[in-house]
Amino acid sequence: MCSSDLQIQEFKANLIRPTNYVDVLTLNLFDEFCSFLDQKKFLRHPSMLKYLMEKEQSAPSKVKSTQDTLARNAHSPEFVQFIHQRIIDHITIKDQYRRPYVFMYGIGSMYPYLRVNEFLALYEDYNETDKYKIIVFYPGHRDQNSFRLFDTLPDNHTYRATLLINE
């Protein structure tokens, strides 16, 4: 685990204390994407992820085709549904904990296949804001109502999100 993973897990652990009774779902979007691809069959191959990795190794000239396939799958309704099902499975657990938050991170690892604004736009039809809130840990900084990925790449999209930590 890298330091940001540890920080997010520590933050989650602090919320589950008996005085809070909050159980947060933490989703590394990149890891979830890899799981999605690994479970997805492709032609006669049981795992699209393994197929794409083998293809990239054996045919470096086909890297563009592999990247296009990754981007197409990252934007697919099936991937969005996969994430939604993970969230629904978590928030519907019946026990003493409240589950009002989903921590989403690993967004930077998805670049250039998927950007945070693209994912949030794709997920908007699924989002049930009365049941849970998605909190995105973003590798960059806010510039007015837009963000700069890795403090380098301008996003040029306006967000309705609220900044939780004052700069």
Residue ranges with predicted function:
Residues 20-21, 95-98, 129-130:
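Short helix-terminating capping/connector loops at secondary-structure junctions
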Residues 96-113:
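Conserved P-loop NTPase "ATPase switch" module shared by AAA+ and STAND
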Residues 25-78:
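Long, charge-dense
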Residues 7-32, 132-133, 141-156:
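An interfacial alpha-helical scaffold signature
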Residues 113-167:
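Glycine-rich, aromatic-bearing surface loops/beta-hairpins
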Residues 78-95, 123-124:
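A short, acidic, amphipathic alpha-helical segment used as a generic capping/interface helix at domain edges
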Residues 27, 104-107, 137-140:
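Short His-Asn-centered micro-motif
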Residues 2-3:
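Short, small-residue-biased leader/transition segments that mark boundaries at the very start
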